[in-house]
């Protein structure tokens, strides 16, 4: 018998991102989800700047994202779809994921504040 896994806020943000993409008719790989959550703007992600989770996890890395996505697939919140042409896995939210998403969103306060990436000055010219 499979144990239940209770999602955390980061899992909620990942599920919300994938749900948003699925509603628009898109599916994303782990790299695509990471690009949206960390706020990378390029030709693939510029149309998703209005996504509620765009740029909310700026310090997340690829290893953590893959781990979280695999865990969500294991517990049935996401479905993994293999694309033979691109030789990559893409993710789609399941019915269980949709129910959990609506329940978690209505019972928990989640901050979807966008984080600005302002690089700090690390080298300055020495004054006279």
Positions of predicted regions on the chain:
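Accessory DNA-binding and partner-docking regions appended to nucleic-acid-acting proteins
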Residues: 1-128
């Amino acid at each position: 018998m499979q144990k239940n896994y209770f999602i955390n806020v980061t899992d909620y943000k990942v599920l919300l991102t994938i749900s948003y993409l699925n509603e628009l008719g898109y599916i994303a790989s782990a790299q695509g989800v990471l690009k949206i959550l960390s706020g990378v703007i390029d030709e693939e992600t510029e149309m998703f700047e209005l996504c509620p989770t765009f740029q909310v996890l700026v310090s997340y890395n690829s290893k953590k994202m893959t781990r979280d996505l695999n865990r969500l697939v294991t517990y049935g919140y996401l479905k993994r779809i293999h694309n033979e042409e691109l030789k990559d896995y893409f993710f789609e939210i399941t019915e269980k994921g949709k129910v959990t998403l609506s329940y978690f969103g209505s019972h928990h306060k989640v901050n979807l504040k966008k984080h600005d990436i302002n690089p700090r000055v690390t080298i300055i010219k020495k004054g006279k």
